[in-house]
Every structure is written in C-alpha cells, then in structure tokens.
A protein has these predicted regions:
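Extended hydrophobic/Leu-rich segments
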Residues: 13-14, 106, 110
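Winged helix-turn-helix DNA-binding recognition segment
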Residues: 46-108
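Short recognition helix of helix-turn-helix/winged-helix DNA-binding domains
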Residues: 1-69
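Single conserved hydrophobic/aromatic residue that forms the stacking wall/gate
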Residues: 110-113, 117-118
C-alpha cells in the first residue's frame, strides 16, 4: 500500500490531537508514559466538545464523560492498560480527577491545567 502526498490546501483537511509540550519537557511529568500523555491529549480534545455543549459543573468547571471502553478504543489497547493510563494521569501526574456518580454509572472526569510554574 502506498500513500499519496499532500497537495496545496489538503494539509488543512485533517484534525489532530494536541498534546501539550510541557508534558514532555517538564520533569514533573517524566514519570508518566507517552501513552498516558497521548490519552491526556485525547481528553483535552473531548473537553473542548464538552465546553461547547455546556457540560459545566456547579463550580463552573468543564467535565467530560470518558469511559474505559472509550479509552480502549481510542488507543487500541486492552482494558487493563486503559485503566493503568487513566490511573497514571490521575494519581501520578494529577492531571485528571474522576468522580463516580453512583453504582453502575459513568464517572465525570475533570481535567486539570497542565501548566506549571517555571
């Protein structure tokens, strides 16, 4: 299989996940895997959709609903790996906070700002 080249304005036709550079350059985040950093970029993308849809909690914070199955699909990985990556973002890096809404329901996830003082 061969791929054709991009021509002219075609390069603007695709959407991309944006992964904050600070996750790779600041030693505070060196303890989390590249896959977890990629997942954070995917969660940031989902957050912008949630903001557009008005998914704001009572404290004015945007939240997302992103299940383990969605993480598995997004990264093409097994369930245990998806759980591990979300745990890295929450417990190791402090970049997300998951709140369970009740037994058998999905968790609300709040993303935390990734900026750190230099």
């Amino acid at each position: 299989m061969s791929f054709d080249y991009f021509y002219g304005q075609q390069s603007d036709l695709f959407t991309f996940y944006r992964v904050p550079k600070v996750l790779f350059t600041n030693e505070r985040f060196w303890n989390i895997s590249a896959d977890a950093k990629m997942l954070y970029g995917i969660l940031l993308d989902r957050m912008s959709l949630s903001a557009k849809n008005g998914w704001i909690d009572k404290n004015g914070r945007v939240y997302i609903i992103f299940t383990i199955d969605e993480a598995k699909m997004a990264l093409n990985c097994a369930e245990q790996k998806a759980i591990k990556l979300l745990s890295e973002l929450e417990k190791k890096a402090g970049l997300i906070e998951r709140k369970r809404q009740g037994l058998g329901t999905v968790s609300y996830t709040h993303l935390r700002a990734h900026e750190t003082p230099e």
